[in-house]
UniProtKB/Swiss-Prot annotation:
Similarity field: Belongs to the ATG12 family.
Main location: cytoplasm
Domain of life: Eukaryota
Keywords, ordered alphabetically: Acetylation, Autophagy, Cytoplasm, Host-virus interaction, Isopeptide bond, Membrane, Ubl conjugation pathway
Compartments, record wording: Cytoplasm; Preautophagosomal structure membrane
Taxonomic path: Eukaryota, Metazoa, Chordata, Craniata, Vertebrata
GO terms for MF: protein tag activity
Domain-related comment: Shares weak sequence similarity with ubiquitin family, but contains an 'ubiquitin superfold' and the C-terminal Gly is required for isopeptide linkage.
Misc. comment: Small amount of ATG5-ATG12 conjugate is enough to perform normal autophagy.
Known tissue expression: Ubiquitous.
UniProt-recorded name of the protein: Ubiquitin-like protein ATG12
Region annotation (Disordered) ranges: 1-50
InterPro entries hit by this protein: Atg12 (IPR007242), Ubiquitin-like_domsf (IPR029071)
PTM section of the record: Acetylated by EP300.
Length: 140
């Protein structure tokens, strides 16, 4: 039984060694490649576009900041940190004069014009970006 798989593995090698096998395979692979690449490109773009348009963000409260019941949110890649701050302030019904700080992975505060997609690419893990929010300065 061990000889049969070896001979099966050797057959493609011997076919590849012969020029006829490569010529026969080339038209067959050439014909499926354009449709598959055309099918893969839109297929890849559509799911990648869906997943890349929306990023999962896990929002965690720090200190005396009110805790959001919904912690996991799907946010567009192009949304800025300032947009998130405004959203969280409205969601928590904070006064406009109250400050809200956002930290990435409990380490640094990104700039308000930073896009969420860029932060996700650099600091995302397990398919999500963890952001901590608080009313007083905590880290960095």
């Amino acid at each position: 039984m061990a000889e049969e798989p070896q001979s099966v593995l050797q057959l493609p090698t011997s076919i590849a060694a012969g020029g006829e096998g490569l010529t026969d395979v080339s038209p067959e692979t050439t014909t499926p490649e354009p449709p598959s690449s055309a099918a893969v490109s839109p297929g890849t773009e559509e799911p990648a576009g869906d997943t890349k348009k929306k990023i999962d963000i896990l929002l965690k409260a720090v200190g005396d900041t009110p805790i959001m019941k919904t912690k996991k949110w799907a946010v567009e890649r192009t949304r800025t940190i300032q947009g998130l701050i405004d959203f969280i302030k409205k969601f928590l019904k904070l006064v406009a004069s109250e400050q809200l700080f956002i930290y990435v992975n409990q380490s640094f505060a990104p700039s308000p014009d930073q896009e969420v997609g860029t932060l996700y690419e650099c600091f995302g893990s397990d398919g999500k970006l963890v952001l901590h929010y608080c009313k007083s300065q905590a880290w960095g």
